[in-house]
Amino acid sequence: MREPGFWHRPPSWLSRLLLPLGAVYGEITSWRMRKTGVEAGAPVICVGNYHLGGAGKTPTTLALVRLLRDLDEQPIVLSRGYGGRLKGPILVDPQRHDAADVGDEPLMMARRVPVVVARDRVDGAALARSQGASLLVMDDGFQNPALVKHLSLIVIDSRRGVGNGCVFPAGPLRAPLPLQIERTDALIIIGDGTAADEVAAAIATRGGVVLRARLRPDAASVERLKGQRVLAFAGIGDPARYFATLRASGIDVADQRAFADHHPFTVAELESLAETARREGLTLVTTEKDLARIGAAAATLGSAIVPFAVTLAVEDEPSLRLFLLEQINRARTKPRAG
């Protein structure tokens, strides 16, 4: 879905009109979040966000898996498989599955790390354990009560924060903010903005860990596009941030097209983009997630689509590493309720 503009402005008459619906939605979500989950038999680290839409969870999940491997863990990512038709539980195989099967994000991640897709997270956790997982990294699911979470790590964009602070549909929040903050163990703020500062202060006051990070362009991607003019397109939660990252990397973005998150590109849309690129002498560039979703259709265009990859760089990685180690050891010695 494409987020309404009023979600990211001070509360307006429209958001106030929708507040009663937001109150009902918030009550339902709060009730679900308070339910007791099932122990997975291994530590569960949840990478989530407070609001609908993108915040940088996928690059955070991949960065977290890398750190956990450095700690001699065998993490497996557990995903709901949004946008995919398979209910699972299933271990994603990029050679057999496509985005229509398992969703774009799980497919993209599975090219680097083991990923289990399951609508039922308890069943997914069981499969991951049978595949040798020493711990589970949940990509999203902060508001889902199915599994006991031993560490909840929230990702937030420094420019967007929590928007107008209202619960859906009056705003972008998935649940009332105080309850979500109460259940947050660590916060990763992506970027240099100040929109998340109040949330960070609230979490720090409760003893939570607050870290800064930034999205860093992949060096090979930058080198591949050096000296080229590009037409960039993206169907992700925050296309503007992606385009800004391209420009900050020195890429000459001559044209850009933003689509809704998880947008199902049609052949006609792709052909139109390719025709514009050919006419203007531009190189087509998109995200790894979008390219995973486009799949084999890209081969029919007659124009190459270049993926521009980004990774998450945490400013104080040693502190995050130590925090993870402490929380994992605690989870193994003292199970967490709820």
Curated annotation (Swiss-Prot):
Keywords: ATP-binding, Kinase, Lipid A biosynthesis, Lipid biosynthesis, Lipid metabolism, Nucleotide-binding, Transferase. Pathway: Glycolipid biosynthesis; lipid IV(A) biosynthesis; lipid IV(A) from (3R)-3-hydroxytetradecanoyl-[acyl-carrier-protein] and UDP-N-acetyl-alpha-D-glucosamine: step 6/6. Pfam families: LpxK. The keyword ATP-binding applies. GO terms for cellular component: plasma membrane. GO terms for molecular function: ATP binding; tetraacyldisaccharide 4'-kinase activity. InterPro entries: LpxK, P-loop_NTPase. The keyword Nucleotide-binding applies. Its EC number is 2.7.1.130. GO terms for biological process: lipid A biosynthetic process; lipopolysaccharide core region biosynthetic process. It is an enzyme of class 2 (transferase). Transmembrane segments: none annotated. ATP binds at residues 51-58. It catalyses: a lipid A disaccharide + ATP = a lipid IVA + ADP + H(+). Belongs to the LpxK family. Transfers the gamma-phosphate of ATP to the 4'-position of a tetraacyldisaccharide 1-phosphate intermediate (termed DS-1-P) to form tetraacyldisaccharide 1,4'-bis-phosphate (lipid IVA). This is Tetraacyldisaccharide 4'-kinase. It comes from Rhodopseudomonas palustris (strain HaA2).
